[in-house]
Amino acid sequence: MTAALVSVFALQVAVAPPPKFDSGRAWEHLRQLVAIGPRPSGSPAIEQTRKYITEQLTAAGLSVVEQAWEEQTPIEKVKMVNLSVTIPGARRDRIVIAGHYDTKLYRQFRFVGASDGGSSAAFLIELARVLKARRNALTIELLFLDGEEARLPEWSGTDNTYGSRHYVEMARRDGSLATLRTMMLVDMIGDRDLAIRRDANSTTWLNNILWDTARRQDLDDYFIADSTRIEDDHLPFRAAGIPAVDIIDLDYDAWHTSNDTLDACSARSLQVVGDVVLGALPQIEAKVTKSLVLTGRRVHGTKRSVHVLHAKRKVRPRDRVRERAHLSLEAAH
């Protein structure tokens, strides 16, 4: 091989684009997770789920960290485990992209949570493969959260978001919260009839970047213009002063029913969210990096306090929106 050909080959390797999000791979992960069956926190099935997630991430060349603890729920003590992988970037300041992998505990019917618990985990496994090959401006931590679902039938008080609250508290204690710049949450993104609304309890600039990205990609039929208020795993981060956004489709007839199966989901929906998240990531990295450069210090944002005004209520018709508590945010988004 001539020197010229070697140079051309080296240039091609250097500029090769990172792999794209592959919904076929994500769908296969979702299929495998759903095949495990119901996966509530503390169950043998969720242990099997953790094993599958860990095997897939390890095969992608990533090191999985377990964060385990015993949680006192209104029913009993439950072992819970968050899983995370860290993908280094040009800066150690990091973005967390998270989703829960547990399913709600039901004894009266078989609940496999294809979209609610399955889609977020499957999405993150595939996203890990893509981000590992990407040149990241910031360090990215992918976080698989346990214990998002309430143990009692209804979402209330502190019987929910166990994993995200534990993660934030541990990050506060060990000092790692100081390098956490923003958080993106994916939840219930498998809906065959995907309709993601802006969450009014999410940070406005993150919402704007995501919805602008969807519009540029001609995906605004899926990321639609109206909004609702959601209580989810992003709120413990917001309460700690971290900009956070919830990407969630609550307009889902199969939510918390035996019909939340693969038949109610679509690989296309996973692809849409993958394309938007990856398309938005450069802008998010640029905004965070610019802020760090301008301030000349490692700050994680203005502290916001979050107040629950009234409990979540469920509305069952097709165009219902599951409103988990309305919140007021004392600082501007």
Predicted features, each with a name:
Residues 2-21:
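Bacterial Sec-dependent signal peptides at the C-terminal "C-region" and cleavage site
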Residues 16-20, 34-47, 71-74, 107-118, ...:
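Second-shell loop/turn segments in exported
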Residues 28-90:
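A non-catalytic alpha/beta surface segment that caps or lines the substrate-entry region
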Residues 30, 34-41, 57-64, 87, ...:
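Sec/Tat-exported extracytoplasmic proteins
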Residues 32, 66, 84, 94-98, ...:
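Structural recognition of the beta-strand scaffold that forms the well-ordered cores
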Residues 45, 68-70, 182, 189-289:
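Active-site-adjacent substrate-binding region
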Residues 108-209, 226-229, 234:
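Acidic/histidine-rich catalytic neighborhood of metal-dependent amide-processing enzymes
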Residues 294-298, 308-311:
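Aromatic/hydrophobic beta-strand junction motif of beta-rich domains
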